[in-house]
A protein has these predicted regions:
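Glyoxalase I/VOC metalloenzyme domain signal
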Residues: 3-173
C-alpha cells in the first residue's frame, strides 16, 4: 500500500512464471487521487503504462531523449542525496542518475546489491506512459521508487489544482 500526504493506493502485482510478463493492479485508497483522476478523465479503467527492459538505462535514456521523448519530471535532489542511506554501497554513479532523473531501487544487504533502475516518460498515447527499466539482479517492481513516484505525481496534482492543501480527502480521514 502506498500513502502520500493527501491520497493513497493499494497495489498488487501478478507475474508470469518466467517473469517476462508482469501486471500490477492498482486501486484508489480514497477519492481525488491519481487513480480517481485517471478514471474520470478516461471514463473508466485502462492501462496506465507499459514497461520496457533495457541493458544500459543511461544510454537508453540518452538515445530516447535525443529522439525527442519527454520524461516525467525528476524527483527532487533530496531523493538522490538519500540514496546512500537507503541503499548503502549500491555502487551506481549518483550524478549520472540525477542528471537524467533515473530512479534507483532494490537492496544492498550483505554487500550484495540487487538493483532496479527506472525512469518514466510523459503520457504518450492518451493516458499511457512508458517505463524503462534496467534490472541488476532485482526482480521487484521498484516498490521504494513507487513511493517517490507517487509523491511526485501528488505534487503535480497540487500544482494543477486537482488536490488542494488543507482540503480533506477520503485517504486523509
Amino acid at each position: 500500500d502506498i500513502k502520500g500526504e493527501y491520497t493513497g493506493l493499494t497495489s498488487r502485482a501478478m507475474s508470469a512464471p518466467d517473469g517476462k510478463v508482469r501486471i500490477p493492479l492498482n486501486e484508489e485508497a480514497g477519492g481525488n487521487g491519481q487513480i480517481e483522476e485517471y478514471l474520470m478523465a478516461y471514463n473508466g479503467e485502462g492501462i496506465q503504462h507499459i514497461a520496457f527492459s533495457c541493458d544500459d538505462l543511461p544510454a537508453c535514456y540518452d538515445r530516447l531523449k535525443a529522439q525527442g521523448l519527454e520524461f516525467m519530471t525528476a524527483p527532487p535532489a533530496t531523493y538522490y542525496e538519500m540514496l546512500s542511506e537507503r541503499l548503502p554501497g549500491h555502487g551506481e554513479p549518483v550524478e549520472e542518475l540525477k542528471s537524467r532523473g533515473i530512479l534507483l531501487d532494490g537492496s544492498t544487504e550483505e554487500n550484495d546489491p540487487r538493483l532496479l533502475l527506472q525512469i518514466f516518460s510523459q503520457n504518450m498515447v492518451g493516458p499511457i506512459f512508458f517505463e524503462f527499466i534496467q534490472r541488476k539482479r532485482d526482480e521487484g517492481f521498484g516498490e521504494g521508487n513507487f513511493s517517490a513516484l507517487f509523491e511526485s505525481i501528488e505534487r503535480d496534482q497540487l500544482r494543477r489544482g486537482v488536490l488542494q492543501p488543507g482540503k480533506e480527502t477520503v485517504a486523509s480521514k
